[in-house]
Design a protein with these regions (language model features):
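Canonical tetratricopeptide repeat
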Residues: 76-78, 88-92, 126, 160
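Conserved structural position within tetratricopeptide repeats
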Residues: 65, 112-115, 146-149, 211, ...
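N-terminal leader/linker segments that initiate helical-solenoid repeat arrays
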Residues: 32-88
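Short coil turns that delineate tetratricopeptide repeat
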Residues: 68, 84, 118, 152-153, ...
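TPR alpha-solenoid repeat register
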Residues: 72-74, 89, 123, 157, ...
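Short coil/linker segments at helix-helix boundaries
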Residues: 73-87, 167-212
Length: 226
């Protein structure tokens, strides 16, 4: 009986070990199990030459995880930029670099993708995000405006533009008030300029902010409660 119990214990332990190893295998990318970026990229070349674009993209994604520098070099030197698969490979690198928080490189490859698909809204939104992360607020503003030309209900673009114009209005209003307070005895003309300046701020910046944020609440009314 003890022998049977021992055998059952060993069998259970072995099964748990096999289950753990299988789980680790599923969790780890193929490159972890010994394939270098160069090996994977060689397979990418073969897949591309055989017209297996989906498989090539999958391998290319693994190669980026195994060695982003080698994979990027492969893109610049070995990929036909006029091919249908080229923007898909650029998108792989854009997403990879975004996840790695290399915003300059991510921006570069989103722009590369957008050369072929200039009206792709998700890519434009991601590009605008990278512009913000790179401190290019004005560029992000223009990109989000383009997004709304293609998708007027885009949540992220409406929120960004609403907040942008609201903060701009607050900044302009504060400057007008501070400058006016510096005048000891304002004339009627100076007062009129001050009032006209405030009117412009409320009409333009505050007005734009209100329009964008109201759009958010119209499309996503649940956000009002939040």
């Amino acid at each position: 009986m003890r022998l049977i119990g021992l055998l059952n214990y060993i069998y259970t332990l072995k099964m748990k070990t096999l289950t753990l190893l299988f789980s680790l295998f599923l969790m780890c990318p193929l490159s972890v199990w010994g394939q270098s970026a160069d090996e994977l990229l060689s397979k990418v070349s073969d897949a591309l030459s055989e017209g297996k674009d989906d498989y090539a993209v999958s391998l290319f994604r693994q190669a980026a995880n195994a060695g982003e520098d080698r994979t990027e070099m492969f893109y610049w030197t070995n990929v036909d930029k006029s091919s249908e698969v080229a923007p898909r490979l650029a998108d792989v690198l854009a997403v990879h670099y975004k996840e790695m928080r290399n915003y300059d490189k991510a921006y570069l490859f989103y722009k590369e993708f957008l050369q072929r698909h200039p009206e792709d809204v998700p890519a434009l939104v991601s590009c605008a995000e990278m512009e913000m992360m790179r401190g290019k607020e004005k560029d992000a503003l223009k990109t989000y405006e383009k997004v709304l030309m293609l998708d007027a209900d885009n949540l992220q673009a409406n929120i960004f533009l609403g907040n942008y114009y609201y903060l701009q209005a607050e900044k302009d209003k504060k400057k007008l008030e501070e400058d006016y307070k510096k005048i000891t005895s304002p004339t009627r003309m100076q007062y009129a300029r001050y009032r006209n300046g405030l009117s412009d701020v409320f009409t333009n910046s505050y007005g734009k902010a209100k329009a964008y944020l109201q759009r958010v609440l119209q499309v996503f009314p649940s956000m009002e409660a939040g």
